[in-house]
Amino acid sequence: MEKILSKVWISNGDSINQYVCIWDTGSMETIVSDKVISDLNPDKHGYVYINTIHKEKKSDKYILQLSLEGHSQSIKINPACFGKSREFDVIIGMDIIQHGLFILDKGKFSFTIDQLK
């Protein structure tokens, strides 16, 4: 099965960087990689326990802004960190997906949140 990958922009309020994200309807919350945390050095805002493939681990949470391709406004997120990046640095979870129109049709993907256009 193919992965749904796209571009997102993450900001700490001072800097903004582009990252590759994967869309995961099985993930309850949006999370970011160590690379995002290292690049942007955001403020910590609590912690959470996350389940990875190998184990449950404690992860700090951070305050960041996420911008989606084709949208002019950003979304405030409070992501945890999933660890080392792979081919993507952001996992978009249902905390964001539930607010928009998620379409996967014959291999073509689109996602829109009308309020952020």
Predicted regions and their residues:
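Pepsin/retropepsin-fold aspartyl endopeptidases
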Residues: M1-K117
